[in-house]
Amino acid sequence: MGVAQAAPAHEKGELDCHPVGEVGIIATQSYWTNHYYGHQHYDFKESRLEPTEERKGKPKKKLQFYECKPPTSKLNGTTAQHWFGQLRVADEPTKCVTTTTWWVKTKDTGAYGGPGYTSRPEGKKTETTLKECSTSEETLRLQWFGMTRPSKKNVNAALVHKGYAEDEEAFAICGNEENTDEGKGSYFCRASDM
């Protein structure tokens, strides 16, 4: 006689997720000497994250954060301050914001004396795109985000790409320098000394 055990939800192609917070867009603010300035809105053009042509342009793709129970201990779970899960297209909830890399701290010093960071896998072009939402552990690493729980009304939530619990948070948006046929593109990054 044996005990029948069900496969974990993510192995059956399911994640336990539900929408939290408001539908919104990806936007950044620059911060310098105690002042915020320079809002920049982002949209997905042909599934690639790019800045809108006008800094405060109206993105076509609205996004919804989905809090998900982590199907593996490699991923962070929700805390009192942060939700963790997937960032999905509001009107296409099978499409998820997906990075091509994750960030790790290096032994090197950053440009301004703080810690240095690099993306992995080494040599992979860093991009943020829209892909089918996944339940595979490897792809979840590229689709696992954290979002702050706003403590006040009308306060925007902060968004980070988290990946595995051991990975560094990518809390900034950087632009690819090289021009390609598809455009420059933008991605979640971990900038030194920010």
Question: Where do the language-model regions lie?
Answer:
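Secretory targeting and sorting signals
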Residues: 1-7
